[in-house]
């Protein structure tokens, strides 16, 4: 496998709709001043989260069960910032919609700005021919509330080209998260 460069990422985004909306170069400021950067980088793409958040709460004393997840365990918030309680987590989605080519596997890593504050971003790989908005999971590992900024960079996508094309893609097997557009809860 080889990692793909900024030139390849830009070409695939502009000519094949791999990332939409797409930002060429890094954006580090907006009308309000400095922000956490997003856009294409040397060997990746820094994504933004939207202003749709689901903040985990255990007001119902539920057991966290991925096979039978209780939607009432979340509070929906629409805001330019999300405050995650101590030792808790929140879900969000990317602003960007992805269409992953059949010969590409995409890995997501959290941005160091958040990691250095004890905020971990977790996303599973984007498989060949998967498409949709990426559901992001933010874990607050600290004993204090933590802030996430909507419309700013939160994670970096790395694009890896396979040595050969897979026999069965995510689309071929009708993956359960194919085409997701909102913050998507666990499915079985």
From Swiss-Prot:
| Keyword line | Hydrolase, Nucleotide metabolism, Nucleotide-binding
The GO terms this record gives for MF are: dCTP deaminase activity; nucleotide binding
* Active site residues per record: 137 (proton donor/acceptor)
Q: Name one Pfam family in it.
A: DCD
Among CDD domains, the record links this protein to: trimeric_dUTPase (cd07557)
Q: Name the chemical reaction catalysed here.
A: dCTP + H2O + H(+) = dUTP + NH4(+)
Per the record, the pathway is: Pyrimidine metabolism; dUMP biosynthesis; dUMP from dCTP (dUTP route): step 1/2
Q: Which intervals of the chain form a coiled coil? A: none
Residue sites binding dCTP per the record: 111-116, 135-137, 156, 170, 180
Q: What are the EC numbers? A: 3.5.4.13
From what superkingdom does this record's organism come?
A: Bacteria
One GO BP on record is: dUTP biosynthetic process
Q: How does it assemble?
A: Homotrimer.
Briefly state the protein's biological role.
Answer: Catalyzes the deamination of dCTP to dUTP.
Q: Which family does the entry's similarity section mention?
A: Belongs to the dCTP deaminase family.
* NCBIfam families in the record: dCTP_deam
Q: Which PANTHER family match?
A: DCTP DEAMINASE (PTHR42680:SF3)
Q: What name appears for this protein in its UniProt entry?
A: dCTP deaminase
Q: Which gene encodes it?
A: dcd
């Amino acid at each position: 496998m080889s990692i793909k460069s900024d030139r390849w990422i830009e070409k695939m985004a502009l000519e094949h709709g791999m990332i939409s909306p797409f930002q060429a170069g890094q954006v580090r400021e907006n009308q309000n001043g400095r922000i956490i950067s997003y856009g294409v980088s040397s060997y990746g793409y820094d994504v933004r989260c939207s202003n749709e958040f689901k903040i985990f709460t255990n007001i119902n004393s539920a057991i966290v069960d991925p096979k039978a997840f209780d939607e009432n365990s979340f509070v929906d918030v629409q805001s330019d910032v999300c405050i995650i309680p101590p030792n808790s987590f929140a879900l969000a989605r990317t602003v960007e919609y992805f269409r992953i080519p059949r010969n590409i596997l995409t890995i997501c890593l959290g941005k160091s700005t958040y990691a250095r504050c004890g905020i971990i971003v977790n996303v599973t790989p984007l498989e060949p021919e998967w498409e949709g908005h990426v559901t992001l999971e933010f874990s607050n590992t600290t004993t204090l509330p933590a802030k996430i900024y909507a419309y700013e960079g939160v994670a970096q996508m790395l694009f890896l080209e396979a040595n050969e094309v897979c026999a069965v893609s995510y689309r071929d097997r009708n993956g359960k998260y194919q085409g997701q557009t909102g913050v998507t809860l666990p499915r079985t």
